[in-house]
């Protein structure tokens, strides 16, 4: 059993046995009913990527390709334009969060990255002084929230640190998330930001180090309890999945493409489970 599978089962068990029910929930199911959830607070996980620990479960298939494309949309294209996400990457699941008929998700995610020139500033800081302690990506922009409607960012802050170990530089990352749908999005979000960590490390020719993941509200929606029990019953696959970025060290961050990533040794348990998402 991989570390990700162990933590997945532990979190499901903890939510189902110790979690409390939400009240006055904002999300709705497609039938219009309120999407309440059972949740715990303050969930934390640590993975040492340099030792082959990756935050992806084998208990069900995780659609990692589309998740990584979303990261490119946010941090390379730096846009909130759904046409770009749909046409360039073939990813459509954000369409449910379109604001009005604007063709965008509002001033969120990529729009905030572009507004503050976040990636270029981050890369410059790391180039000038890899050991500085100010390498922060923050998508929590109150001014942007007042400017337009739109879903507030769930994965809203990422921090980076560099360590020298036996003469080699390792890039660590910490992802902070205000809210996470445990069964559907947990490993998608984690692997997205591992991909971002790998892109930044490759830009400098560094190795990837540790990935820390903190979630304030970790939940299972009340229409997913049956799927939660099914996942607890499943025995994990014997594979040991790893995400690989097949570009030379020193490849510019903006020259990396989604197809440069490969998920190897991944043989998840099937069949896939169906989820009615909360919007």
Swiss-Prot record:
Pathway: Pyrimidine metabolism; dTTP biosynthesis. Homodimer. This is Thymidylate synthase. Its EC number is 2.1.1.45. It catalyses: dUMP + (6R)-5,10-methylene-5,6,7,8-tetrahydrofolate = 7,8-dihydrofolate + dTMP. It comes from Streptococcus agalactiae serotype Ia (strain ATCC 27591 / A909 / CDC SS700). It is found in: Cytoplasm. Pfam families: Thymidylat_synt. GO terms for molecular function: thymidylate synthase activity. GO terms for cellular component: cytosol. Catalyzes the reductive methylation of 2'-deoxyuridine-5'-monophosphate (dUMP) to 2'-deoxythymidine-5'-monophosphate (dTMP) while utilizing 5,10-methylenetetrahydrofolate (mTHF) as the methyl donor and reductant in the reaction, yielding dihydrofolate (DHF) as a by-product. This enzymatic reaction provides an intracellular de novo source of dTMP, an essential precursor for DNA biosynthesis. Its main location: cytoplasm.
């Amino acid at each position: 059993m991989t570390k990700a599978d162990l933590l997945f089962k532990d979190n499901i068990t903890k939510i189902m046995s110790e979690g409390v029910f939400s009240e006055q929930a904002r999300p709705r199911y497609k039938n219009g009913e309120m999407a309440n959830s059972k949740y715990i607070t303050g969930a934390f996980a640590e993975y040492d990527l340099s030792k082959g620990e990756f935050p992806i479960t084998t208990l069900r298939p995780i659609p990692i390709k589309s998740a990584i494309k979303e990261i490119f949309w946010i941090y390379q294209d730096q846009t909130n334009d759904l046409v770009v996400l749909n046409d360039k990457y073939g990813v459509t699941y954000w369409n449910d969060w379109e604001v009005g008929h604007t063709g965008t998700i509002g001033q969120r995610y990529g729009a905030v990255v572009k507004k503050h020139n976040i990636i270029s500033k981050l890369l410059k800081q790391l180039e000038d002084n890899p050991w500085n302690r100010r390498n922060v990506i923050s998508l929590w922009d109150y001014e942007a929230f007042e400017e337009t409607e739109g879903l507030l960012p769930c994965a809203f802050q990422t921090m980076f640190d560099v360590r020298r170990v036996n003469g080699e530089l390792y890039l660590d990352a910490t992802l902070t998330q205000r809210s996470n749908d445990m069964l559907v999005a947990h490993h998608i979000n984690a692997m997205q930001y591992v991909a971002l960590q790998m892109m930044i490390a490759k830009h400098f020719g560094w190795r990837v180090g540790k990935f820390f993941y903190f979630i304030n509200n970790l939940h299972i929606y009340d229409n997913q309890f049956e799927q939660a029990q099914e996942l607890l019953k499943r025995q994990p696959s014997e594979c040991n999945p790893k995400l690989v970025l097949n570009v030379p060290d020193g490849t510019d961050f903006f020259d990396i493409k989604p197809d440069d990533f490969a998920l190897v040794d991944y043989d998840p348990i099937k069949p896939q489970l169906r989820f009615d998402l909360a919007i």
